[in-house]
Amino acid sequence: MSSLSPASEVILRHLDHFADRHVLIAGDLQDTLASQIQAKSVRAYTNQYHQWLPLLKSMGDNAFFGLAADQSFVKYCDTLIYFWPKNKNEATFQLRSLCASLSVGTEIFIVGENRSGVKSATELMNGIAKLKKIDSARRCSLFFGSLTYQTLFDRNNWWQTYRYDDLTVMALPGVFSQTALDEGSRLLLSTFDDAMVGDLLDMACGCGVIATVLGKKNPMLKLTLCDVNAAAISSSIATLNVNELEGRVIASNVYSAVEETYDWIVSNPPFHDGLGTSYQAAEDIIRLAPNFLKKGGKLRIVANAFLPYQDILDHVFGSHEVLASTGKFKVYQATKK
């Protein structure tokens, strides 16, 4: 088998149990265990576009990407293996959604790294499934139980809203800046003083607040937003709609689904993938930006001040500017010549 996460290695210790089961694997899928596990049938659901793409190649229609798995996709599954994400609210949202579609009696395995907060699974599932801890290894815990109560789930009950700059921001669990605008995005937005026109791409858009603020102030901007997270896609669409703005919102692993070129690429790029720290997405945003910028187009990003993006910007663009700086964040701009 290919390299597996510690949580997946714990699941490997119980492979014999799944041989006669119809398995649904969901949650934070950090590897391709779903395409390698042996069972009567295996399906995989993820809300992360970059996790879905490799599964799609090996599993085809048995891999699902979206905010919530369709009932038709999960109804024949009798076993759920859920990989706990770092965000408890996201786990709650996903498990409530899944347990509304799965049948009573479905076996439930919940696994995750101890530092992720997986030990709160028993409390979270109280009244839905009685879980007990059945294994502990690789600094992970595995819980097991069966579904005793099918939940009621309405995604409209899960929205968080807040106000920023006279705009309404809509966000679902697991989306960055779900309850308030983060300091980095505030600093980035503070650097936009002049009127803007043309085509703008908000990369790693989260709840869509950056594009929404800029679009509201600059009605001649044509907005495109992208993210890997299905919850972010839904949140960005909702944020645009509630503020009466038009924009195209797409799922994309950095630029993988981007087909046009832009006058502006703006981003508050992530530097985490699951529990781990990863700068790959942010570096790819910079390295590949010239391919998606028009001549004279600008990349403007905010990043933690300690991250070494200056050298990458200079290597790719030849030079860069620092438009704003605090002790914690810097806003960089580079122009395609």
From Swiss-Prot:
<dbReference type="Pfam" id="PF05175">
    <property type="entry name" value="MTS"/>
</dbReference>
<comment type="function">
    <text>Specifically methylates the guanine in position 1207 of 16S rRNA in the 30S particle.</text>
</comment>
<dbReference type="InterPro" id="IPR029063">
    <property type="entry name" value="SAM-dependent_MTases_sf"/>
</dbReference>
<keyword id="KW-0489">Methyltransferase</keyword>
<dbReference type="InterPro" id="IPR007848">
    <property type="entry name" value="Small_mtfrase_dom"/>
</dbReference>
<keyword id="KW-0808">Transferase</keyword>
<dbReference type="InterPro" id="IPR013675">
    <property type="entry name" value="Mtase_sm_N"/>
</dbReference>
<comment type="similarity">
    <text>Belongs to the methyltransferase superfamily. RsmC family.</text>
</comment>
<dbReference type="InterPro" id="IPR002052">
    <property type="entry name" value="DNA_methylase_N6_adenine_CS"/>
</dbReference>
<dbReference type="GO" id="GO:0003676">
    <property type="term" value="F:nucleic acid binding"/>
</dbReference>
<dbReference type="GO" id="GO:0005737">
    <property type="term" value="C:cytoplasm"/>
</dbReference>
<dbReference type="InterPro" id="IPR023543">
    <property type="entry name" value="rRNA_ssu_MeTfrase_C"/>
</dbReference>
<dbReference type="GO" id="GO:0052914">
    <property type="term" value="F:16S rRNA (guanine(1207)-N(2))-methyltransferase activity"/>
</dbReference>
<protein>
    <recommendedName>
        <fullName>Ribosomal RNA small subunit methyltransferase C</fullName>
        <ecNumber>2.1.1.172</ecNumber>
    </recommendedName>
</protein>
<keyword id="KW-0949">S-adenosyl-L-methionine</keyword>
<keyword id="KW-0963">Cytoplasm</keyword>
<keyword id="KW-0698">rRNA processing</keyword>
<comment type="subunit">
    <text>Monomer.</text>
</comment>
<dbReference type="Pfam" id="PF08468">
    <property type="entry name" value="MTS_N"/>
</dbReference>
<dbReference type="InterPro" id="IPR046977">
    <property type="entry name" value="RsmC/RlmG"/>
</dbReference>
